[in-house]
Amino acid sequence: MLNLLQNLYTEEHSFKEAALDFTTKEGDILGSDKISGLEIRLSHVIIKDNKTAKIFPFPGLAKIYFLTLVVSDVENQIINLELKGFEKVDDGDALSIDKTIFYWKQTKKEKVPSQVHVMTSIIKSKQSLRDVAKIMENIKNDSDYKDLAGKLAEFIKDANQFSNITNLIGTVSSIVGKHLGKVEDKPFLTWYQSFTDIDGDWDKLGKTYKHAENKYAAMDLSITIRDKKRE
C-alpha cells in the first residue's frame, strides 16, 4: 500500500524567525494584514536515481507520477490537488515542472492567508501510466476524499488545529493510492512544507528558497512575499 510518509522530508517555516534577518526599526513590524501578495513556486525537480536497473536490452527508464497538494486558509483555495505523469524518466532527468502552486494577491475585502501547507510526492509506477485526468476525477468523486476536504476546510479556520491538519494531509496517500494502480509503496521523495504566519508576522519580504533532497530525488520551493508599502 502506498505510504507517502516514507522518504518524508518535512519542515515548518516560521516567518517570525525568518524576519530576524530583515532589518527594521523599532515599532515598524507590520501585521499580516499589511502584505499585498504571496506566491509559492515549485521547480527543479530532479530524479537522481530512478531505482530501475539497466539490463540490456532494457534502458532502465521509469514511469513516474508527481503529486501536489496545497492547503490554505484562503477561502477559494482551501485545497488544491494535482497529479502529473511522466514516461521514460532516466537517472539525472529533470521533470518538466516549473510552476506557481499557490498565488494570492491583495484585494480590499479578502483576508490575508495565515497558513499554507504544501505536500509534494514523487511516486514510481509499476505499470503503464493511467489517464491522469481520469484518476483526478475518480479521486475527487471519492467519498473519503470529499470527507477529507470537508474536514480540512473546517480545521484550517482554527490555528489550534495545526496538528490535525498535518495528520489529515498525511492520510491523502491511502486515498490516492487506490486510484493510481500498481505503484511502489515507498515514494522517491515526499516533501511536506508548512508556511505559517506566526503571531501575524509575514516580515520576510522578497523570495525565500527551500530545498529538499535525498539519494533518489531533489526539488525546490520558493515563496515570495510582497508589500507595496515596504518595497
Task: Show the residue positions of the predicted features.
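N-terminal amphipathic/basic membrane-interacting segments and domains
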Residues: 1-231
